[in-house]
Amino acid sequence: YHDEHQNAIRISSLKKFEGDLAFAGFAAKFVVSGHESYQIKGKRYLVEKGEYILGNAGTMASIEINGHDDTKGLCVDISERIINEVADYHFSQSGDLKEFLLTDQFLVNTYKARNTNLGYALHEINRQVSGGQHSNELLNTELFYSIAESIVADQAIIYEQYSRLQFKKTETRQSLFRQLLEAREYMDAHLSDDIHLDQIIRNAFMSKYHFIRLFKATFILSPYQYILRKRLESARVQLLGGSNVTETAF
């Protein structure tokens, strides 16, 4: 489905593909099964099942799909007009956020769908599209605004955290922030394990002290405080769901 404003929903199923692509509007490329490889500004992004990559209209990518089975994907394009409208509605001073979202300042990155508002929306859209539920124009117009709300909500948090990193070189700033996000995702995925700092920073090219310092500056909490808070949140959800204290204890 697509409209005259450059909003679109597309599904794909390919075993092999190689080519260049210019992102249309604000685009999320979600991998339903398999994996896709993106090369953007000299950096490689491997997008696995349950993950998506996010870019704006200035993003140029080389894409490669090469699998034994079909790689199934969902692509959602949102026009800059809608992103502007939603950002202006939710933020009284949206200029800096919009500049981050819609210019070459934007942080292209991959995200695990289970951890974001947009990821939840993409899962739901894939379910509905697979069931043939997206044929009504009004429904799709409302859907694009809803997706834009998810993007703006997620990226407003990213922008706030990213802005706390004070480095003059944009490449350095972006690289360090991606490493911090990757480390945080590792923590989220291993909350029930005995996590060690060496494991968390295994792919980060920095010392333990430098990592702790940057993590706390960016996310306000130290790595230990972050893990503790997430474990307490998880325990609370389990208790509310009927689990007993013994089952819930880490």
How should these model regions be labeled?
Residues 5-6, 14, 29, 105, ...:
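A short alpha-helix capping/helix-coil boundary motif
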Residues 85, 103-168, 175-178, 182-185:
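An amphipathic alpha-helical interaction segment
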